[in-house]
């Protein structure tokens, strides 16, 4: 049986589909066309309690996802992702609402 946090931070196939369509089936960084399975990048990382919800997920090809997680330009990639999500969702988007809190699930 999965813990509440594990379930809350997972990205469901339904969420991947929503995110992939929102992102025009492309990596938000390089605009490379990718399959729906690439709609799997958390803005607030799963290890930090980042929820598997569209507001916290974006589409990134393997190369850009690695750069966003570990690359030398990590901060620049993170800024692009944050601006992308903030521009899409507007004033309703905020970091606090993207983090799992016990009892939310």
Q: Where in the sequence are the language-model features?
A:
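Short cysteine-rich loop/turn motifs with clustered Cys
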Residues: 10-39, 61-63
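Major-groove DNA-contacting interfaces characterized by cationic-aromatic clusters
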Residues: 1-5, 35-36
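Short basic/aromatic active-site micro-motif
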Residues: 40, 44-45
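Polybasic, low-complexity binding patches
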Residues: 3-7, 47-58, 66-105
């Amino acid at each position: 049986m999965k813990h509440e946090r594990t379930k809350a931070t997972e990205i469901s196939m339904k969420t991947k589909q929503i995110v992939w369509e929102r992102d025009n089936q492309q990596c938000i960084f390089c605009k490379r066309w990718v399959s729906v399975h690439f709609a799997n990048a958390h803005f607030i990382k799963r290890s930090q309690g980042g929820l598997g919800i569209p507001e916290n997920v974006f589409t990134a090809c393997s190369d850009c996802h690695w750069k966003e997680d570990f690359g030398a330009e990590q901060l620049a990639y993170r800024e692009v992702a944050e601006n992308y999500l903030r521009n899409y969702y507007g004033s309703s988007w905020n970091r606090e609402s993207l983090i799992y809190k016990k009892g939310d699930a």
